Amino acid sequence: MRALVSVWTDSGFAALTWENCVMILVGLVLLYLSIAKEYEPLLLLPIAFGCIMANFPNTGFEDEMGVMMAIGFGIKYEIFPPLIFMGVGAMTDFAPLIANPKTMLLGAAAQIGVFVALAGAMMLGFNVQEAASIGIIGGADGPTAIYLTSKLAPHLLGAIAVAAYSYMSLVPLIQPPIMKMCTTKEQRKIKMVNLRPVSHFEKVVFPIVVAIVVSLLLPPVAALMGCLCLGNLFEVSGVTARLSDTAQNALINIVTIFLATGTGLTMSGDKFLRLETIEIIVLGLIAFAAGTAGGVVFGQIMRIASGNKINPLIGSAGVSAVPMAARVSQVVGLKDNPSNYLLMQAMGPNVAGVIGTAVAAGTMLAQFGG
């Protein structure tokens, strides 16, 4: 009997708290959404499993000297997000942005959601570092959100990562109502001219120039932009096919496993089940909605300035959920005009949003990082 009591007291069941039970349930829900509904499964699945494992008592996952130390090292010291950006860069085609550089303005306009949420978070009592980390959810860029949060507010990493990736997966549900609210049916029918061809020289020069300019203007974000541009250079140079293939397949997949699982391991019940978590999720939705609206409204301004040659729907693609936001612009446009194909035009502001979110993060790091 004494042996049985000893086994029980040493087991996880004896130390299980209601917070652990709730977070295990949250992890199971996230697992369901990632598997059954296919909501960002490559990210939400390892986050969900990490969340479940983090809430098993007496396993060592919650100890700094345990597994969390090994995986968390890459998050704490900002190793994983730049490597993710290298893979993203290798998979990104900047040609639509190069062909129509004006769409860079739409990527910038969509960042208004970041600063709307920042202001809202400060009104709710978050300090400026926490508010900046919450605001970056509006950029719809998970690696950038993790990168900024790990520097400014690491204690909020789990909530912010889950909010960022959840809203990225819900782009097709969140954006269309906002896009329709900000446009008329006739405006959504506008057809845009085909983009001009982009030369190999332009494709090679673009990432080099972006890396130099952004890194000199905003040194805190040089790691992200440098890796993004290096990955893209692997792809467009034409001489590093093996490196490009590794960056956009093996490397990004391996790093995603560690980054997402490590993020999930930060979601222990005692840290996650707080009022501030609900506030972060709500503010993240506001940020994402404001970013979408900001892009469409600026698209309206460009439509007027161009004499109805620009469809304002492409403005919603200014958030950096690549390529989901661009696909949503195409889908909404096709519903009102079946011959209207906006995907390539929308990819311009979409990839501009990747740069814009990184620049916004760099600006906040420069201002609030001290």
Spans of features found by a protein language model:
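N-terminal alpha-helical transmembrane segments of multi-pass membrane transport
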Residues: 1-66
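Hydrophobic transmembrane alpha-helices of secondary-active transporters
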Residues: 30, 53, 74-98, 231-234, ...
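Interfacial helix-loop-helix linkers and transmembrane-helix boundary segments
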Residues: 36-44, 61-72, 91-106, 240-249, ...
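Alpha-helical membrane segments and immediately flanking helix-loop junctions
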Residues: 77, 85-91, 106-116, 120, ...
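Entry/N-cap segments of selected transmembrane alpha helices
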Residues: 97-118, 268-295, 346-350
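Alpha-helical transmembrane segments
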Residues: 155-173, 283-291, 314-315
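Membrane-embedded hairpin module used as a gating/binding unit in multi-pass transport
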Residues: 166-239
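Transmembrane helical segments that form the transport core of multi-pass membrane transport proteins
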Residues: 211-295
